[in-house]
Amino acid sequence: MIGTLLEWARTHKEGKLRALFWLYRWFRFSVVPLIYERGISLRPDWIPGYYALGNLLALKHSSMLSTRDHDVRKASKVGQRALECFQKVITLDPEYLEGYQDCSSMLVSMGKVAEALHVAERAFNMQRSLAERYQLDRLGIRFISSVGATNSIGAMVHVDAYVKAEVFGLKPPGKPILLVKPGQSIHNPHFLNYWRQYITVISDPTTVECLLPLVRYLEDAPHWGVMCGKQFLYHPSAAAMIYKLWEDERRPPLLTLSRDDYERGWDRLKQMGVPKGAWFVCLHVREAGFKDGISSQSAYRNADIETYLLAMKNIVARGGWVIRMGNPTMKPLSIMEHVIDYAHSELRSDWMEVFLCAQCRFLINTSSGVGAVTASFGVPLVLTNYMPTCALLYSSQDLFIPKLCWSMDQQRYLTFEELMSPPVSTSVLQHQYDYMNLKVVDNSPLEINDLVTEMLDRLDGALVYSAEDEQLHERLRTLTAVNGTLYGLDDFPINCRIGRDFLRKHASLLPLVDESETRPTLSCSETEHPANSFPNNEDVTNE
């Protein structure tokens, strides 16, 4: 319903029905909440009223922050009231599982990840208790949340980790099942088909309807949080831990490209001008438009395709081809030799996207979901303009460089310690950076090209790291372990490697070797999220 309204809003908010849209928006966000507030004042134990008001205010909170000139403090007051409503729901009815889920999501949007995870863990424990009460745990099944598995291709990386967790006995026992409701959108149906060997996908309407009542008691949401053994972990941290275990045992990737996809994929490439046997690199640079819509909350993850031209020319000069991935909403590329703008090709298809990700020499990516496909096939990643750093879940074969953050208050770059620690490392929405008065700084064309060169040299067997390079690398890895970059994992360093030249260039941002020296740090007022600044913001775990 919400998605339909947002789509309608995108279509009509600037058209002939603009006035009607804003009238509807005013009524929904200003009048309806007052009606619910009045109802709650008359009936303080009205659970559906609290829940409906909480969801309405959560939507208003998101809408307020999606505008370019948003007021973070005003929006935070709305978000705080939404949080209070969800807290009240689970206080009045501890078995109201949906209340935990929305409360947890609200806490994340307010920058309170620790509390959000605690609430999510409480929800998991309550769910398990209810399943045992009704003996549903004896069925030997678990449902995978369809929100992550179908709506976003990026969330499929957590399905990959979820399946691997089963191998290690780290997830709740049970046959994994994914329900696809009638009319439910699937981002890439062909990629989902590859996972049918590991999970049972059910789309028959009658069967889905019969099983849906069981979902709330037996559902796992690997795109949000995972119970790994006895520890409930934030999804990127869970994936990082599982990927490390998988790599340490030298296990192969779960997916292998089918013979049919291999043959027709190379036939399609030939149509595009790429000779069979040529090597190619895929490139995906996230831009506003595809998922952002009217929202700017993911703006910090975007980058400019023009800053990748130098790296493209480098690949071509070394005998390769570049396949630019994406969709037609993206900025078109100018014509370049041995560069194919597949994002604007009439030959785009879901199966071809899978083929390209599985067959490329490596993928140059930003903080976008396509990396989930390549990772599932074991293809190396070159992660550029990467944020947030808590999502650095990939393997030692992958390289990355993060965006840096400039403190507008102190007129300096954040150190790696600050960048790799909460609250910056766990800031998943643009307004969280705005509140800390941080300007997110994109990688330069030279920095991107240096990282691509490093991967090319590595794959060619020509890469050399000096003793100083290794020392800098270990200092950064140690920093990520000590400061909890992978949130919730104690003394667990990131596994992927930061770009050699990037680290050389910004070595001054590493902790000082001489501990007697001092360096300015962000003050408490700069690092606190607005939710922490308002009175009566009680910890939901105390209720």
Regions found by a protein language model. Name each.
Residues 39, 88-89, 123:
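Canonical positions in the second alpha-helix
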Residues 49, 99, 132-133:
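TPR alpha-solenoid repeat register
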